[in-house]
Every structure is written in structure tokens, then in C-alpha cells.
A protein has these predicted regions:
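Conserved Rossmann-fold dehydrogenase catalytic segment
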Residues: 1-2
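Helical element adjacent to the flavin cofactor pocket in flavoenzyme catalytic cores
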Residues: 5-61
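Glycine- and acidic
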Residues: 5-9, 131-135, 190-193
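Active-site nucleophile and cofactor-binding loops and adjacent substrate-binding regions
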Residues: 8-9, 167-169, 193-199
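Secondary-structure transition/capping motifs at alpha-helix termini
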Residues: 28-33, 153-161, 217
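Active-site substrate-recognition segment that forms the wall
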Residues: 40-49, 57-97, 101-187
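C-terminal lid/capping helical subdomain adjacent to the catalytic/cofactor pocket in oxidative enzymes
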Residues: 185-191, 195-220
Length: 220
């Protein structure tokens, strides 16, 4: 399926959920708090912006909007700049050491250069994680395992008849110009969004730039 590729030994790959959990634990250790299942229904700008949820409100000196594809219609100006796109992943049953080495020598992580890219790597227990299928409807296909299995075996025919143990989907935010977006709606309301499926590294870079701006330390 592929005519060639670039092997970059300077890059690495990681377990994104473990990264998220580790960062949440670091935030808690610094005295921060995370409130899940707290849908924001309105943001009122001002000298002290007010963020309203379905159960109450929060007044803050600074607000950062980082909901990406999950912002909905909360801020129409931002919603018009990002298209939620469903990206799906399947995980095979654990592969034999020989088969795992055959399909991905060196335990590398791979992605292709398309905007709606495919990506794949091995898990610690030698499952192949194969992701992609970005579509612009934001909807998960009814036969997710079947659709992703077909894509996987086009790349790895060696995996014909391999069981698929897990399948899931989530939204990624595709920017209208295919570039990440950051900026301000006012002096104290910032936003960062639209990573087009490449968010693990850029989210951290853009968060740092935004934090420096808020702290008055930005020289970029």
C-alpha cells in the first residue's frame, strides 16, 4: 500500500492515557482540581469571566478554552473554525512475538502523511493498535470492527483472520486551514484547538505558549 517511508529515530511514542493520568496526578499534586461531567453551557466575558455549568458557575481571572472538537456550539466563532471528525481505533488479540516483529520491526509507531491519517503501533502486550478512518460526518460507522479490519488487512495482509478484541472512536478537531489554532477572544479568555489528529505533541507546545502569555513571560 505504501511506496516508501521516513524512519525517524529521533522521535518516540507513548501511551496517551498514561500521559493524561500522569499529568492529572501532577496537577492534583500542585493543588489543582479537575471536575469531570461538568458541562459548560455559557461563558460570560468581563473583568472576571464567569463560566456557567448546568449545576453552578465559576468566576475566574483567566479562562482557557481547550475543548477542541468537543466544544459544540458554546462559542460559535470557534465552532466555525473546527470540524469534528470521528477517528477510530481497533486492537487485535495479542500477536506472537514472531508476527509482531514481522509486521513492525523494532516496535516502531507509524502514521501516514494525510490529513485524515492512518496510524498504528504495538501495545505492551503485542496487540496491534490500528487507527484512522477520519470522516467529516463526526459519526462512527455501524460496523466499526469490520470497516477497520478491512483497512488494517490492506496494510498488513499477514493479519487476515486475526481476532479484533477492542474497537472505539473519538472526535478529533480538523481546522479549516488544517493548522492548529490559538488566540484570544478577549484579554482574559484564551483558546487552543484544531490539531487535525496530531495533538499529543502540539497540545503541550501550545499549552506552554498560552501559559507563558497568561503569566506575562512570553517572548515568542
Amino acid at each position: 500500500r505504501y511506496l516508501g517511508g521516513l524512519h525517524n529515530t529521533a522521535n518516540g511514542h507513548l501511551h496517551p492515557l498514561n500521559l493524561c493520568i500522569g499529568e492529572a496526578q501532577a496537577l492534583n499534586a500542585l493543588g489543582g482540581a479537575i471536575y469531570e461531567q461538568s458541562r459548560v453551557v455559557a461563558i460570560e466575558p468581563g473583568a472576571l469571566p464567569v463560566v456557567r455549568t448546568e449545576a453552578g458557575s465559576i468566576t475566574a481571572k483567566t479562562v482557557v478554552l481547550a475543548g477542541n472538537a468537543y466544544m459544540g456550539g458554546l462559542v460559535p466563532k470557534l465552532s466555525k473554525q473546527v470540524l469534528p471528525s470521528a477517528s477510530s481505533v481497533i486492537a487485535t488479540a495479542p500477536l506472537s512475538p514472531e508476527l509482531a516483529q514481522q509486521i513492525l520491526p523494532g516496535d516502531v509507531a507509524v502514521c501516514d502523511p494525510r490529513t485524515a491519517l492512518d496510524y498504528f503501533r504495538l501495545s505492551a502486550d503485542r496487540r496491534l493498535l490500528f487507527g484512522g478512518l477520519s470522516n467529516y460526518t463526526g459519526m462512527e460507522p455501524k460496523n466499526l470492527k469490520g470497516v477497520m479490519y478491512k483497512k488494517m488487512t490492506q496494510v498488513f495482509p499477514e493479519l487476515e483472520n486475526t481476532a479484533i478484541d477492542y474497537a472505539w472512536s473519538g472526535w478529533i478537531g480538523i481546522g479549516i486551514n488544517r493548522m492548529p489554532q490559538l488566540g484570544q477572544l478577549s484579554d482574559n479568555i484564551h483558546y487552543i484547538q484544531a490539531y487535525s489528529g496530531h495533538g499529543v505533541a502540539p497540545t503541550h507546545m501550545m499549552a506552554r505558549v498560552t501559559a507563558e502569555k497568561i503569566a506575562g513571560e512570553s517572548t515568542r
